Amino acid sequence: MRNCLVAQSGGPTVAINSSLAGVIQGAIDSKKFDKVYGSLNGVQGLLNGCLMDLTEKVEQVPMFIELLKKSPSMYLGSCRYQLPDYTEDDAPYAYIFNKFETYEIDAFFYIGGNDSMDTVDKLNTYAKAVGKDVKIVGIPKTIDNDLCITDHTPGYGSAAKYVASTLLEIGHDTSIYPINSVTIVEIMGRDAGWLTGASVLARNKYNHAPHLIYLPEVAFDEAQFIEDVREAIKKYNNVVIAVSEGIKNAEGKYISATSAVEDTFGHSQLSGTGTVSYTHLRAHE
């Protein structure tokens, strides 16, 4: 028999260790693998030779898998490493697949979001190109629910609950004042408004917040935004606005991207959408 390898990457969620537990338990139950190895800090663990025997861990700690399901953060750690195009630099790929042979790995499971799935795709493409029979499997995890062809991913539900709970508390806190107020809450979501949209769950018969919601899927119109706020203030006095970090104007340009920096995968690290929205409001007082 052969072995399998699993790694985690991206940001932590309340569910990502449950996915890891599922891989370990599933591999053991299948009886197709002698050992389940874990790569520490994502694909970088492979490049640095940092692997651990998870099968041994299960044998040493009988409750390990059950404890893992309830553990926060990421048991195997994470990374922000981007593999190069193998046609330009195949050295990391050759090293990784050499490790697969050394540890007799038949299947590699990578738990993560879009960037992790990019790594999965690159490794799978390389494997086919050089005739390596290693199964490369991506396991979805992302709190902003933006993985293609995926209805909802592990991690989104808990993040959506957090957003809704936070907006509910903000709504109650701001409603106590007799003066007009506008509170803008900027929520994660570069190109997908699922998390910001989840803020609507805060509404109930005692709380109308968030009164206004702006998503990246709909072009942001400054004039309409100002008018929306004016009408909301007339009706509610204290207005709470949920706005996605990735809202764009009619030209498709990010509202907050003027001073954005890029991460290791070339994504704009957006911030300041709330500040820009606030500036628009102050300019039309």
Where would I find each of the regions flagged by the language model?
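N-terminal phosphate-binding or glycine-rich loops at protein starts, especially the Walker A/P-loop
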Residues: M1-L51
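Glycine-rich oxoanion-binding loops at beta->alpha junctions
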Residues: L51-I105, L168
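Oxyanion-binding "anion nests"
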Residues: I233-Y254
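Conserved small/polar residues in nucleotide/adenosyl-binding loops
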Residues: T279-E285
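Short, acidic/small-residue loops that bind anionic groups at enzyme active sites
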Residues: N124-T153, G157-A164, P210-E217
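Conserved anion/nucleotide-ligand pocket segment
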Residues: I179-Y214
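Short glycine-rich or small-residue beta-strand-to-loop segments that form or flank ligand, phosphate
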Residues: N3-T13, M74-C79, D106-G112, G138, ...
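Short Gly/Thr/Asp-enriched flexible loops that form oxyanion-binding sites at enzyme active sites
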Residues: S19, V23, D115-V130
